[in-house]
């Protein structure tokens, strides 16, 4: 799989060309009525030869239709074509069909020299005798693009593009099973577009298992599928919104018309088509409610109340967040500032499609390791009430006296707070994310518990002598969360609510994706892996829903609380952002986990916090610039001007 960023249609057994006019539905749970397509006029063809397709394309071009999908399949001597054209205005375009590689490359170079961009490429046949079809358009906004054909490894494309950010827009599989070839096309990525690309190399990479995994991520969908002659499917998924969608695979020509008719009755448009097979062609089609993805809209809500020039603070803060979110493709965020636990600045930001929630200041975001601040406050309460001492040895306190590494008996509560307990995630796996591994080691089909994880770790050697150096560890706060429950007889969350939160609205972010189907805040990640909830299955889910190896119910004390930025800024007005005790000047805590990024910062007078619904921005430098330069300078200037 390549992770960086469909369309299909088809027609009748007795017809090689048809015109479809589809009206959008009057009701829909996904798209507001104002955002649905009005009337879409399409022209869909399939199972026609080279002479026919040239005639068809010329006629369509003359009538104002534009290509959205073009596919060549079959043998070089008897190539067949399928395509979708839509009637709409647009940039000039050129097409080529049935060209050998020499002719195709010359055509590509000719139109590239005239400022055209390759937008579609398709090939069929063996490597030595392949034939190509393609579309090029004059799109001034695309300044850089890269297309490679004739490679046996699609990952060679990444080497060709180097560090340049690229959105892969098309893939074509051709050649033979023993000498497979790929065409890969990509355009420059100017807005951190999120996608995953699956290049199959064998039948074990079945689209029917890929799609369910990819779509555990809310709003993700297939945008492109290409079929090899032996029916392997290359696919591209992204998180753009087109309302309802569906994919149909393995359709014979005789099944196409009925499928088109059925989908039309549901107001679904075919947007992409691919065929394969030299005898009986089978087709793959993507249907969508919206022919083109929804555009994003900018929203900023909330109040600024605590400064001499509130309007200017609002303007400056909004400019910082708008610039960051648009450049980094971040959809949801909050920023808050408080003094002595009272919120004086609260802004919620949305850069998203109309079928997603507009963020409010009260919405709760996954906090990642900012959750640890609440655990430290809970431990502080345990110490202040005499339940434990910082010098207590953690494992004997929990009833464990025979670890595999005797040095484990020397680990104190203070060591865990200071990240000096002997756990180095640079030497061993990050213990917070090995719940899947623990369950698999026990041949257990149910999720590993925190107790099982602790006992798994106890059977391993430490990475270094406790107390000799500090290395950030999620395991320390897992142990502290277990300690809280073990010594008080309450759940971690119950203890927090009774002794720490004082009415603040903080919750646990649960693991199952089904729990978050209707969440206003979508914690976004493009990555998937084996679910920690079903560790012995092959089921893959979004990392935020257990694909990262974490069971959040067990790891809540380390990185699985959710709250608003307002709540966080108020909390650190009373408690240390980092460390034990009351509020501390110029201390901060940074949190990152799949699907989230957050930061809490105490300055001289101001306490401020930021929450994002993803950590998949351009790079870590983008985050550091946002929080440690732009926001730090803004809040720092305001902080210094506030009265003591």
From Swiss-Prot:
Secretion signal span: 1-23
Molecular function GO terms recorded: serine-type endopeptidase activity
Keyword field: Disulfide bond, Glycoprotein, Hydrolase, Secreted, Signal, Virulence
Entry keyword annotation includes Nucleus: no
Regulation: Not inhibited by phenylmethylsulfonyl fluoride (PMSF; serine peptidase class S1 inhibitor), clavulanic acid (beta-lactamase inhibitor) or ampicillin (penicillin-binding protein (PBP) inhibitor).
GO cellular component: a single term: extracellular region
Coiled-coil region: none
Active site residues per record: 369
Intrachain disulfide bonds: 149-183
Reaction(s) this enzyme catalyzes, per UniProt: a glycyl-glycyl-[protein] + H2O = N-terminal glycyl-[protein] + [protein]-C-terminal glycine
Primary location group: secreted
Family: Belongs to the peptidase S12 family.
Protein name, entry field: Polyglycine hydrolase
């Amino acid at each position: 799989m390549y992770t960086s960023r469909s369309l299909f249609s088809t027609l009748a057994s007795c017809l090689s060309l048809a015109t479809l006019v589809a009206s959008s539905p009057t009701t829909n749970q996904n798209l507001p009525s104002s955002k649905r397509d009005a009337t879409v006029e399409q022209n869909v063809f399939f199972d026609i030869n080279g002479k026919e397709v040239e005639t068809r394309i010329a006629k369509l071009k003359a009538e104002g239709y534009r290509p959205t999908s073009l596919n060549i399949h079959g043998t070089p001597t008897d190539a067949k074509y399928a395509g979708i054209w839509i009637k709409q205005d647009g940039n000039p375009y050129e097409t080529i069909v049935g060209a050998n590689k020499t002719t195709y490359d010359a055509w590509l170079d000719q139109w590239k020299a005239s400022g055209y961009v390759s937008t579609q490429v398709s090939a069929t046949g063996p490597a030595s005798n392949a034939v190509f079809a393609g579309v090029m358009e004059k799109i001034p906004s695309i300044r850089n693009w890269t297309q490679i054909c004739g490679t046996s490894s699609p990952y060679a494309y990444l080497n060709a593009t180097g560090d340049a950010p690229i959105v892969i827009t098309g893939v074509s599989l051709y050649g033979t099973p023993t000498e497979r070839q790929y065409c890969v096309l990509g355009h420059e990525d100017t807005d951190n577009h999120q996608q995953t690309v699956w290049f199959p190399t064998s039948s074990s990479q079945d689209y029917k298992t890929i799609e369910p995994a990819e779509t555990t991520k809310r709003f993700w969908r297939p945008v492109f599928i290409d079929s090899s002659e032996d029916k392997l499917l290359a696919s591209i998924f992204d998180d753009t919104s087109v309302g309802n969608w569906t994919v149909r695979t393995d359709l014979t020509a005789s099944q196409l018309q009925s499928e088109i008719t059925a989908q039309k009755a549901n107001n679904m448009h075919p947007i992409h088509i691919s065929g394969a097979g030299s005898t009986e062609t089978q087709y793959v089609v993507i249907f969508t409610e919206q022919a083109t993805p929804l555009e994003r809209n900018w929203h900023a809500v909330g109040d600024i109340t605590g400064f001499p020039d509130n309007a200017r603070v609002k303007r400056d803060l909004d400019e910082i967040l708008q610039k960051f979110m648009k450049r980094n493709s971040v959809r949801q965020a909050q920023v808050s500032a408080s003094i002595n636990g009272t919120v004086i600045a609260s802004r919620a930001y949305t850069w998203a499609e109309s079928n997603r929630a507009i963020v409010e200041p009260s919405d709760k975001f996954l906090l990642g390791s900012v959750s640890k601040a609440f655990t430290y406050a809970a431990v502080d309460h345990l110490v202040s009430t005499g339940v434990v001492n910082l010098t207590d040895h953690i494992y004997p306190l929990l009833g464990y006296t025979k670890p595999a590494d005797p040095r484990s008996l020397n680990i104190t509560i203070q060591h865990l707070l200071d990240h000096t307990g002997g756990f180095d995630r640079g030497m061993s796996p990050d213990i917070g994310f090995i719940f899947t591994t623990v369950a698999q080691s026990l041949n257990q089909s149910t999720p590993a518990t925190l107790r099982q994880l602790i006992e798994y770790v106890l059977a391993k050697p430490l990475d270094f002598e406790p107390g000799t150096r500090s290395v950030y560890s999620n395991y320390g706060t897992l142990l502290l969360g277990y300690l809280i429950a073990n010594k008080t007889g309450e759940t971690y969350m119950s203890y927090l609510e009774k002794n720490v939160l004082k009415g603040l609205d903080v919750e646990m972010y649960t693991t199952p994706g089904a729990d978050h189907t209707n969440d206003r805040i979508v914690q976004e990640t493009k990555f998937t892996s084996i679910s920690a909830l079903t560790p012995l299955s092959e089921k893959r889910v979004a990392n935020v829903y257990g694909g990262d190896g974490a069971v959040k119910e067990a790891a809540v004390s380390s990185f699985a609380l959710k709250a608003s930025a307002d709540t966080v800024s108020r909390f650190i007005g009373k408690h240390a952002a980092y460390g034990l005790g009351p509020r501390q000047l110029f201390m901060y805590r940074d949190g990152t986990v799949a699907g989230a990024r957050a930061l809490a910062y105490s300055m001289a007078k101001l306490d401020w916090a930021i929450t994002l619904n993803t950590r998949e921005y351009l790079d870590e430098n983008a985050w550091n610039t946002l929080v440690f330069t732009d926001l730090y300078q803004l809040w720092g200037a305001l902080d210094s001007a506030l009265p003591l």
